[in-house]
């Protein structure tokens, strides 16, 4: 029988790395975080396993330029959410070797704030993560970035949230438009206010996914384009 295993390669920006005493400490932290991600993904009830292939903590001298290239002009304390995803795609498309090549999802963890600044706006909309929708298994597209600015509150929820975007789900309350999946059920039937992970995350439901999210992920996983997450169970 086939098992569904989503394999991750995690990279951390130099500011994130600086919070730890060693590269091993970064890896240990991310490993604990992924236990939390697995617990949240389990609420989809789709028997999806998450597997951490490895972690590369960037340091000032080794950090690729795509991170600094993604800062919001005039607001350099922020990473531009749209730019970071675009620049990550380009970088890992050109550096498609090793763990980056093996991974189903490549995720960047940063400590800087992330935001979106629309033309004409002066206020930045702050967000916790950004990713390429429905792009698991799609080389050169299978990327996301998450903010984690606290040593104690491991942001497993943000990683799980962005993972599910990559696995074909919109936010609760949103239809399938923009998913790039013509026959996806979308999530318009599950109100944002129900408080699930892809919605407003309330006390009652904030640690689980809605039925709509489940159906969207199930749909993408039924397509040939998601074949990279299937493997022989004996592995």
From Swiss-Prot:
Activity: how regulated: Inhibited by EDTA.
Cleaved signal peptide residues: none
Tissue-level expression: Expressed by the venom gland.
Pfam families documented for this protein: Reprolysin_5 (PF13688)
Family: Belongs to the venom metalloproteinase (M12B) family.
Enzyme class: hydrolase
PANTHER family per the UniProt record, alphabetical: ADAM A DISINTEGRIN AND METALLOPROTEASE DOMAIN (PTHR11905), ADAM METALLOPROTEASE (PTHR11905:SF159)
Function per UniProt: Acts as a metalloprotease. Penetrates intact tissue and specifically cleaves the vesicle-associated membrane protein 2 (VAMP2) (part of the SNARE complex) involved in pancreatic secretion, thus disrupting the normal vesicular traffic.
Amino acids binding Zn(2+): 161, 165, 171
Cellular compartments annotated: Secreted
Residues annotated as domain Peptidase M12B: 4-233
Protein name: Venom metalloproteinase antarease-like TpachMP_A
């Amino acid at each position: 029988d086939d098992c569904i295993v989503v394999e991750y390669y995690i990279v951390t920006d130099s500011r994130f790395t600086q919070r730890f005493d060693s590269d091993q400490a970064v890896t240990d932290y991310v490993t604990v975080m992924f236990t939390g991600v697995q617990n949240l993904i389990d609420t989809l009830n789709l028997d999806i396993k998450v597997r951490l292939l490895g972690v590369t903590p960037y340091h000032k001298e080794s950090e690729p330029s795509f991170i600094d290239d993604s800062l919001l002009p005039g607001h350099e304390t922020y990473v531009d959410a749209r730019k970071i995803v675009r620049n990550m795609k380009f970088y890992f498309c050109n550096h498609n070797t090793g763990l980056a090549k093996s991974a189903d999802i490549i995720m960047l963890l940063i400590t800087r704030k992330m935001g979106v600044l629309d033309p004409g706006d002066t206020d930045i909309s702050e967000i916790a993560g950004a990713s390429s929708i429905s792009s698991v298994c799609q080389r050169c597209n299978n990327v996301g970035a998450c903010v984690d600015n606290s040593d104690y509150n491991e942001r497993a929820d943000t990683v799980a949230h962005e993972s599910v975007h990559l696995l074909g789900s919109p936010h609760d309350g949103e239809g399938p438009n923009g998913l790039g999946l013509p026959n996806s059920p979308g999530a318009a039937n599950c109100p944002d206010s129900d408080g699930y992970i892809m919605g407003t995350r309330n006390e009652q439901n904030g640690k689980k996914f809605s039925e709509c999210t489940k159906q969207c992920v199930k749909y993408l996983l039924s397509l040939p384009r998601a074949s990279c997450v299937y493997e022989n169970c004996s592995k």
